[in-house]
Every structure is written in C-alpha cells, then in structure tokens.
C-alpha cells in the first residue's frame, strides 16, 4: 500500500518510509491518482504537473479528480467544472454552483457541491451536461459516493458553525439526514464496509450502517481536509494541525502520524515501477 502526500516539502510517497519525488512544483497543494496516473497541482501558482508536462490551471482550483485517462478540475473562483484530455488540454467547461468546493465521480457522472447555491449538481461525462440539481439544506461542501448513494456534509450555520451529515440517493432523489454536528465541514469518505468516516470541526467520527449516532469520536484535530479509505486503512490529512496520519478502521482506532508539517491533498495509490520515468525517486527523508 502506497500513500501520496502533497506538502511544503514537495510530493512525498510513503510505503513503510518516506521518499521524495522531485517534480517542477515546489509546493504542491492537491493531487489525484488513478492507478499509476498521478496529477499534481499547485493551486496557489496555478500550475498542473502530469505525465512530465507542466500546464496552467484556472484560478481557485479546489479539487482534482481523475476520470479514465482524463482530468477534472473544480474552481471556486470561476465557479466552473473543467474536463481535460489525456494531454491536459481543456475540452469542456460548465458552470457549477457558487463557490463550489468538492466533487465526486460515479461511473459517467460527476456530482458537484454547489456550496452557496444550496444544490448538488449532477453532470454527465464526458460532455459535462447538467442532468439534475438537488436542492439540499445549507451549503453543501463535501461529498463522497458509494455507488448511487451520496454522503454529504453541508454547512447549516456559520456562527456557531453547524454541519449536517446526510445521504442522498441518485436514482430516486431521496434525502436522509444522518446527524447534525457542531463545527465546520472538513471531509467525508466511505469505508470498504459502506460505513461513513467524517471530519467535522476538531473531530473524526464514524457512523455505522443505518445509524444516526457515531460509534467512534476522536478529537484533537485541527480541521481534517482530506480523507481516503482503502483496505481497512484510513488516510487523514489535517492541514490546520499540519500533519498526515494513517489509522486502522478497526479498534483501537489509534491514528499514527506519518508526517508533520504543512500538508495538503493525500491519497492511496498503486504506482508500478517505471510508470513515472521522469520522477526520479529520492530516498531522503522529508
């Protein structure tokens, strides 16, 4: 199992120990992996690096997603979703909400959190045609997909901050609130057993299937921004606290700190030797 982390130290890979992967981006903030394909972004300087190429991004990119051999970006400044081809040329752009800040892919659809317009927007791929928009309570800010069921975090109130965790069925549009939680929207992901892990405020919470009460509540986080679950492992990036952690999704739920420092996007990846020939791995510790 390999982990990628975008950090102030550059692009880092962890598989028992850290190695630094040199790239032209000195301070990457976002990344996306799909098999052996890794896309890396510096959203501050609007740069994208993928497959040996550097290209320019729109301002305000919040999210990178890989779809087949193509790339999706979501910008909270242009309020647009953009699909790029395999050579990082923009193919099509569609308006998507007001200050949109997250999206998820389900087969040939992409679901966008429209944030300030109060809707979840459903687009078809690859034409980015909007096929549905579901009004939801508050400002939807985070989304994870489990087949045709979406799990979302929506900010109901900023002062004091309150977040609604809910599920929505893509086929029927049925809406099911799960829990009202104190704190800002952080991140949400779905485990292999279809249960929910959510970062809200300073907490990490786990909700079993069909439960509105968390059976795990861990504190002492800053604000978790990225969560990824794979093979009973939970990867956590907490930029506010400046750390990346790995945890088993079974008791005793003890997060292990992998990295301390300024960090951004993280993900699990399976990268075969030789698939990134221009990324010469250094074994120096960050």
Residue ranges and their predicted role:
Residues 1-25, 29-33, 286:
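An edge-strand/N-cap motif at the start of beta-rich repeat modules
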Residues 2, 37, 70-71, 109-111, ...:
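Conserved core beta-strand positions within WD40 beta-propeller blades
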Residues 5-9, 40-45, 73-77, 112-117, ...:
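Conserved beta-strand positions in repeat-built beta-propeller and related beta-rich domains
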Residues 16, 43, 51-52, 76, ...:
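Inter-blade boundary loops/turns of WD-repeat beta-propellers
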Residues 17-23, 52-57, 88-95, 129-135, ...:
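A short beta-strand motif characteristic of beta-propeller blades
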Residues 230, 237-286:
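Blade-level signature of beta-propeller repeat domains, shared across WD40, Kelch, NHL, RCC1
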């Amino acid at each position: 199992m390999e982990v990628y982390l975008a950090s102030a130290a550059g692009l880092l890979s962890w598989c028992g120990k850290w190695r630094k992967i040199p790239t032209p981006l000195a301070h990457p903030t976002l990344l996306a992996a799909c098999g052996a394909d890794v896309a890396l972004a510096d959203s501050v300087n609007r740069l994208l690096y993928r497959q040996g190429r550097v290209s320019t991004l729109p301002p305000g990119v919040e999210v990178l997603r890989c779809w087949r051999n193509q790339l999706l970006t979501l910008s909270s400044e242009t309020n647009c979703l953009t699909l790029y081809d395999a050579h990082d040329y923009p193919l099509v752009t569609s308006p998507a909400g007001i200050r949109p800040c997250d999206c998820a892919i389900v087969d040939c659809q992409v679901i966008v959190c429209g944030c300030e317009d109060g809707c979840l927007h459903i687009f078809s791929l690859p034409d980015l045609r909007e096929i549905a928009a579901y009004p939801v309570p508050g400002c939807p800010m985070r989304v994870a997909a489990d087949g045709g069921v979406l799990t979302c975090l929506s900010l109901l109130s900023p002062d004091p901050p309150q977040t609604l965790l809910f599920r929505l069925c893509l086929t029927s549009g049925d809406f099911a609130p799960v829990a009202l939680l104190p704190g800002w929207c952080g991140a949400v992901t779905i485990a292999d057993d279809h249960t929910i892990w959510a970062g809200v405020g300073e907490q990490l919470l786990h909700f079993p299937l069909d439960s509105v009460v968390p059976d795990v509540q861990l504190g002492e986080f800053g604000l978790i921004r990225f969560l990824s679950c794979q093979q009973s492992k939970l990867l956590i990036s907490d930029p506010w606290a400046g750390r990346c952690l790995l945890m088993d999704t079974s008791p005793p739920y003890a997060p292990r700190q992998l990295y301390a420092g300024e960090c951004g996007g993280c993900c699990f990846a399976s990268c075969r030797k030789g698939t990134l020939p221009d990324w010469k791995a250094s074994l120096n510790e960050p």
